[in-house]
Amino acid sequence: MLKLFSAFRKDKIWDFDGGIHPPEMKSQSNGTPLRQVPLAPRFVIPLKQHIGAEGELCVSVGDRVLRGQALTRGRGRMLPVHAPTSGTVIAIAPHSTAHPSALAELSVIIDADGEDRWIEREGWSDYRAHSREALIERIHQYGVAGLGGAGFPTGVKLQGGGDKITTLIINAAECEPYITADDRLMQDCAAQIVEGIRILAHILQPREVLIGIEDNKPQAISMLRAVLADAHDISLRVIPTKYPSGGAKQLTQILTGKQVPHGGRSSDIGVLMQNVGTAYAVKRAVVDGEPITERVVTLTGEAISRPGNVWARLGTPVRHLLNDAGFCPSADQMVIMGGPLMGFTLPWLDVPVVKITNCLLAPSVTEMGAPQEEKSCIRCSACADACPADLLPQQLYWFSKGQQHDKATAHHIADCIECGACAWVCPSNIPLVQYFRQEKAEINAIRLEEKRAAEAKARFEARQARLEREKAARLARHKSAAVQPAAKDQDAIAAALARVKEKQAQATQPVVIQAGSLPDNSAVIAAREARKAQARAKQAAHPMADSAISGDDPRKAAVEAAIARAKARKQEQQAGSEPAEPVDPRKAAVEAAIARAKARKQEQQAGSEPAEPVDPRKAAVEAAIARAKARKQEQQAGSEPAEPVDPRKAAVEAAIARAKARKQEQQAGSEPAEPVDPRKAAVEAAIARAKARKQEQQTVSEPVEPADPRKAAVAAAIARVQAKKAAQQQVVNED
């Protein structure tokens, strides 16, 4: 009893809500075997024939290729495409493809050479000896994608399933009217399909493998049952004919009773589905080592004289296939790629066959009926009753027409499979599927823009965070660099500050000198001697090289002599015209001694310096200029008055002069004498004699004012003190 119940549950099938029963129209093409089509002279292979990004080109214009040679590299979801025949690549350029708007996509254009030579093929007849990862990689690199219409890369789908797949479903329903590609493939290649199913089961290791096929394919059912007679790991389930039973979510519910959640995938409930055409392509890729270069395409419709199913090479122009089938176009002929419910009309016939092309329908005008005008929605809810996804098409229609994207998303417009059942039953002839496709495209564009904006914002915030981190790191480095001075440095700073304060305090104290006593300058003298000793030590440690002294120019000497004579004449004239001032003989003697010392020094310097050559013309010019200046000074000197002289100041200056004279004589005796320029000495001597004559004349001509004896005595005493102090200082300096 339990065994009978288990057997009953094993063959149990479920149903889904909605669905329609349109005319099947399959008998036009499923009665003839598969046949080959002659090679087209030119093939157009789009780089993107699947869901995902296009692969990277690995050929260039002018390359010769063989059938099965990879034209692109596949990484990740980038599925490679292969050459459908041998020939030459003549162009790599955009070309219109299988799209409702015939959008241009980058394509490789090949001129066939007619030889149809294959690449070297290496099949894995013992595929069980290879790992799961190696099999998946081979399937991916051989370009196998979902041939049921989605075009999802099979290798990526198998890799994503992982170990959570418990049920493998093979979709053999083929529910849309007119299409018989899978039906004919199962009738002619049932054994190869089953072998491909076993390879998929070996990769996924599911608990059960189910084949779902509609009951309107009796020949295909009988062929599969014959092949599966001895197979107990694969179950064939025959389901009632209802459109769209071939949808992934609908067939999953029919065979397992499980519903795929909104926004989810069948793998979320442990189910993975593959098409029978995909299973056949897997077998050829793994066992035979042949990449996917062709597929079965249904050519049907009353405008075709020889309908049937053919092996069409990928990249073959649609026009070439239709002409081979006896296409008889009318004035307003349309050609549909796909079925009448989910397909789209081609704008022209130069588009190529791709991996998702399963049917080319060329109906007559009477077959499709006259186009009817779109009317307003009457809210009859017939579309909601027919929807297999349990949606509300009338609400989605209003949201799509009113650009209310948020409400359309909230009503699960993404779950629409675009089966066309709602448009089929609509009494107002509203093309609901077109509205839904447009709305989903707009929502996808908005989401893509939001994603880009979010990525840009994330990059901006990351940059700002990085800049803040760098700024904080810089501030931390600056704070660590600003180290407080060590204890010994602080002690040195404190000692320096104490010395400065002590000096300031000493400077502010008043200096008191008692009457009749000399000031005590011993501390100042000691400090000065210490500084002088330090300076002499530095000079001894770092001797400086005397710079070479250029010789005197005779022209300059002549000019200076002329100036000296002019000054002498001026002083003589002043002495003759002005009253003479009294002259101090001591001061005159001091000045004479100073003049003699300077003369000796200049003579020594003149003896060691070479003389430069003198131009006589320039010397004469300069002498004339000097005489002119002297005459001008003589004229100015005649008009200037003389100032009176104070005898007390004269006495003080005489005492200071005597002290300086003694000091200079002592220095001259102890220090090496410097060379003296005789010309400068002569000039200075002349000036000194002129000054002496002037003072003598002033002394004779000017009356002497009577002086106060007390003030004179005080001045003389101060002069003697200063002279003694100067003499002591001189002795100290010599020591």
Swiss-Prot record:
<keyword id="KW-0472">Membrane</keyword>
<keyword id="KW-0813">Transport</keyword>
<dbReference type="InterPro" id="IPR026902">
    <property type="entry name" value="RnfC_N"/>
</dbReference>
<comment type="function">
    <text>Part of a membrane-bound complex that couples electron transfer with translocation of ions across the membrane. Required to maintain the reduced state of SoxR.</text>
</comment>
<keyword id="KW-1278">Translocase</keyword>
<feature type="binding site">
    <location>
        <position position="422"/>
    </location>
    <ligand>
        <name>[4Fe-4S] cluster 2</name>
    </ligand>
</feature>
<dbReference type="InterPro" id="IPR017900">
    <property type="entry name" value="4Fe4S_Fe_S_CS"/>
</dbReference>
<keyword id="KW-0997">Cell inner membrane</keyword>
<dbReference type="Pfam" id="PF01512">
    <property type="entry name" value="Complex1_51K"/>
</dbReference>
<dbReference type="InterPro" id="IPR011538">
    <property type="entry name" value="Nuo51_FMN-bd"/>
</dbReference>
<keyword id="KW-0249">Electron transport</keyword>
<feature type="binding site">
    <location>
        <position position="416"/>
    </location>
    <ligand>
        <name>[4Fe-4S] cluster 2</name>
    </ligand>
</feature>
<dbReference type="Pfam" id="PF12838">
    <property type="entry name" value="Fer4_7"/>
</dbReference>
<comment type="subunit">
    <text>The complex is composed of six subunits: RsxA, RsxB, RsxC, RsxD, RsxE and RsxG.</text>
</comment>
<keyword id="KW-1003">Cell membrane</keyword>
<feature type="domain" description="4Fe-4S ferredoxin-type 2">
    <location>
        <begin position="407"/>
        <end position="436"/>
    </location>
</feature>
<feature type="domain" description="4Fe-4S ferredoxin-type 1">
    <location>
        <begin position="368"/>
        <end position="397"/>
    </location>
</feature>
<dbReference type="InterPro" id="IPR037225">
    <property type="entry name" value="Nuo51_FMN-bd_sf"/>
</dbReference>
<dbReference type="InterPro" id="IPR019554">
    <property type="entry name" value="Soluble_ligand-bd"/>
</dbReference>
<dbReference type="GO" id="GO:0009055">
    <property type="term" value="F:electron transfer activity"/>
</dbReference>
<feature type="binding site">
    <location>
        <position position="426"/>
    </location>
    <ligand>
        <name>[4Fe-4S] cluster 1</name>
    </ligand>
</feature>
<feature type="region of interest" description="Disordered">
    <location>
        <begin position="534"/>
        <end position="711"/>
    </location>
</feature>
<dbReference type="Pfam" id="PF13375">
    <property type="entry name" value="RnfC_N"/>
</dbReference>
<dbReference type="Pfam" id="PF10531">
    <property type="entry name" value="SLBB"/>
</dbReference>
<feature type="binding site">
    <location>
        <position position="383"/>
    </location>
    <ligand>
        <name>[4Fe-4S] cluster 1</name>
    </ligand>
</feature>
<keyword id="KW-0677">Repeat</keyword>
<dbReference type="GO" id="GO:0051539">
    <property type="term" value="F:4 iron, 4 sulfur cluster binding"/>
</dbReference>
<keyword id="KW-0411">Iron-sulfur</keyword>
<dbReference type="GO" id="GO:0005886">
    <property type="term" value="C:plasma membrane"/>
</dbReference>
<feature type="binding site">
    <location>
        <position position="387"/>
    </location>
    <ligand>
        <name>[4Fe-4S] cluster 2</name>
    </ligand>
</feature>
<feature type="binding site">
    <location>
        <position position="380"/>
    </location>
    <ligand>
        <name>[4Fe-4S] cluster 1</name>
    </ligand>
</feature>
<dbReference type="GO" id="GO:0046872">
    <property type="term" value="F:metal ion binding"/>
</dbReference>
<dbReference type="GO" id="GO:0022900">
    <property type="term" value="P:electron transport chain"/>
</dbReference>
<dbReference type="InterPro" id="IPR010208">
    <property type="entry name" value="Ion_transpt_RnfC/RsxC"/>
</dbReference>
<keyword id="KW-0479">Metal-binding</keyword>
<keyword id="KW-0408">Iron</keyword>
<dbReference type="InterPro" id="IPR017896">
    <property type="entry name" value="4Fe4S_Fe-S-bd"/>
</dbReference>
<protein>
    <recommendedName>
        <fullName>Ion-translocating oxidoreductase complex subunit C</fullName>
        <ecNumber>7.-.-.-</ecNumber>
    </recommendedName>
</protein>
<feature type="binding site">
    <location>
        <position position="419"/>
    </location>
    <ligand>
        <name>[4Fe-4S] cluster 2</name>
    </ligand>
</feature>
<keyword id="KW-0004">4Fe-4S</keyword>
<feature type="binding site">
    <location>
        <position position="377"/>
    </location>
    <ligand>
        <name>[4Fe-4S] cluster 1</name>
    </ligand>
</feature>
<comment type="similarity">
    <text>Belongs to the 4Fe4S bacterial-type ferredoxin family. RnfC subfamily.</text>
</comment>
